[in-house]
């Protein structure tokens, strides 16, 4: 099994995916253990002094003015975890919880939090054992970080609350720890606060969304090319010299992908000989511009994620010179903004895909295809309602594009009077990405059927490879009406698994 070594300088997106999705094991580097011990010595020294230090010998938030005596500080740290583990609603997915817990461990290992090495090791042990804290959908305002979700994780480290074992069964956390030989942690000064004061949940979901969107944007380029081909469109608009004069990198990449898929097509431009169509509809002609803008949005979001993965988010932090300082780095705005930005791009990519699908089904705009791609229109309805489903998904995508980060609700007696809502932005983006895969699957279903209905014309080799792979995956081709839901589910699974991209790349080579 792959092992991820956590040091003091952050982790990579690949590390997050390996731990969250592939169950990679975690080890702490010697450098990290030394940094943890050094930072802890600073906190211990401050704890021994009479002067109040936030997070070490004071209350929290609006209660930060109260000095806490030494005999109450362990209770203080336990209490902040228990009181902040106040989430409600459905359980959050296992991979999200593993990502946020791993990212909190990343910050702990930076040597900026004052957490003891043994607490960090327990975090790694819990993840390595496949124990997943039960975290709920609602409870984070994205500032001071993802407090409630991280508190539920810290509660598990204490042997309290519920957690899911490696077999998927939810049991009391204390029982699961004991079953795996893991001792619950006894929190000391600052440790409870340090375990829950970060933007790790929203960052983990950003990293996973970017990984999924990398596949989905390639998939969208492929389905756009298939639709262009099925509509007998002109691929001249994909010429690289046209995109070079408007030098957006994402646009050029999408155009190149579509051109690669359409290379050798006997359908694109077929109409030029007898009835020239100078320009295709915007949803076909401008596909690279829309998908490309989304790709550039992803590039910016990836840069933000890269910076956050190298960051140490806590308050207060232990600085290299030994000072312990309060700060505002827990504010989730940098992550929240790009999560919302991505949701807008995802909604528009879904919207343009739905418009292309509708064009394939409309006999007045499909240039010779049967109504709704039906076998016997009137007796058969074809893919009419598949487009309804797609339209419903796009309607939801548009609602999910409303920014969460534009809202802020004050909390903690107005001490925390501006928050990022980054967790909410991440949750709605996760739903949007999920729905985008379904939207692309419907276009794939329609476009492959339409290509097969162009009898006597030869599709591009890459297109033919996609059609054959889709059929092999159990998605039926043209014919009389049948139960569509299984076909749509099979097309959806085909897209999500990356099989669409793999089928096209078996001819084109790697797409951009």
Curated annotation (Swiss-Prot):
Protein origin, superkingdom: Bacteria
Catalytic activity: L-histidine = trans-urocanate + NH4(+)
PROSITE patterns: PAL_HISTIDASE
Gene Ontology molecular function, alphabetical: histidine ammonia-lyase activity
Enzyme class, first EC level, given as a word: lyase
Pathway given in the UniProt record: Amino-acid degradation; L-histidine degradation into L-glutamate; N-formimidoyl-L-glutamate from L-histidine: step 1/3
EC numbers: 4.3.1.3
KW Lyase (keyword) present: yes
Cross-link 5-imidazolinone (Cys-Gly) per UniProt, renumbered positions: 143-145
Compartment list: Cytoplasm
Record GO biological process: L-histidine catabolic process; L-histidine catabolic process to glutamate and formamide; L-histidine catabolic process to glutamate and formate
Identification of the protein by name: Histidine ammonia-lyase
């Amino acid at each position: 099994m792959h092992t991820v070594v956590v040091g003091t300088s952050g982790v990579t997106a690949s590390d997050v995916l390996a731990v969250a999705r592939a169950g990679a094991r975690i080890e702490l580097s010697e450098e990290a253990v030394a940094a943890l011990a050094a930072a802890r010595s600073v906190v211990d020294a401050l704890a021994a002094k009479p002067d109040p230090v936030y997070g070490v010998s004071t209350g929290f938030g609006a209660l930060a003015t109260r000095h806490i005596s030494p005999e109450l500080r362990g209770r203080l740290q336990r209490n902040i975890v228990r009181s902040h583990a106040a989430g409600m609603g459905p359980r959050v997915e296992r991979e999200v919880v593993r990502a946020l817990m791993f990212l909190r461990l990343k910050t702990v290992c930076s040597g900026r939090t004052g957490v003891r090495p043994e607490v960090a090791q327990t975090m790694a042990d819990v993840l390595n054992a496949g124990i997943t804290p039960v975290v709920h959908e609602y409870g984070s305002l994205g500032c001071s970080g993802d407090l409630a979700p991280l508190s539920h994780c810290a509660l598990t480290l204490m042997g309290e609350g519920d957690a899911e074992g490696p077999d998927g069964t939810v049991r009391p956390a204390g029982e699961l720890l004991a079953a795996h030989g893991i001792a619950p942690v006894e929190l000391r000064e600052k440790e409870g606060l340090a375990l829950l004061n970060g933007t790790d949940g929203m960052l983990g979901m950003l990293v996973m969304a970017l990984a999924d969107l990398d596949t989905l944007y390639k998939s969208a380029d492929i389905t756009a090319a298939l639709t262009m081909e099925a509509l007998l469109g002109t691929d001249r608009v994909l010429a690289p010299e046209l995109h070079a004069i408007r030098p957006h990198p994402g646009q050029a990449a999408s155009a190149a992908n579509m051109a690669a898929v359409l290379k050798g097509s006997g359908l694109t431009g077929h109409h030029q000989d007898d009835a020239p169509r100078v320009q295709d509809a915007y949803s076909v002609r401008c596909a690279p511009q829309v998908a490309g803008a989304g790709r550039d949005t992803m590039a910016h979001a990836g840069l933000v994620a890269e910076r956050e993965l190298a960051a140490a988010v806590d308050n207060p932090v232990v600085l290299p010179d030994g000072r312990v300082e309060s700060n505002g780095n827990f504010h989730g705005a940098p992550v929240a903004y790009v999560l919302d930005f991505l949701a807008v791009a995802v909604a528009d990519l879904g919207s343009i895909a739905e418009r292309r699908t509708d064009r394939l089904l409309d006999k007045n705009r499909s240039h010779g295809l049967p109504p709704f791609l039906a076998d016997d229109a009137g007796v058969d309805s074809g893919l009419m309602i598949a487009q309804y489903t797609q339209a419903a998904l796009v309607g939801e995508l548009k609602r999910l594009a409303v920014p969460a980060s534009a809202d802020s609700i004050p909390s903690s007696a107005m001490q925390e009077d501006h928050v990022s809502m980054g967790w909410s932005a991440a949750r709605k983006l996760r739903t949007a990405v999920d729905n985008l895969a379904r939207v692309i699957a419907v276009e794939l279903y329609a476009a492959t059927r339409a290509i097969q209905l162009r009898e006597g014309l030869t599709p591009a080799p890459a297109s033919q490879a996609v059609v054959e792979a889709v059929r092999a995956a159990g998605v039926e081709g043209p014919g009389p009406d049948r139960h569509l839901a299984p076909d749509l589910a099979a097309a959806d699974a085909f897209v999500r698994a990356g099989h669409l991209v793999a089928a096209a790349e078996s001819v084109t080579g790697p797409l951009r």
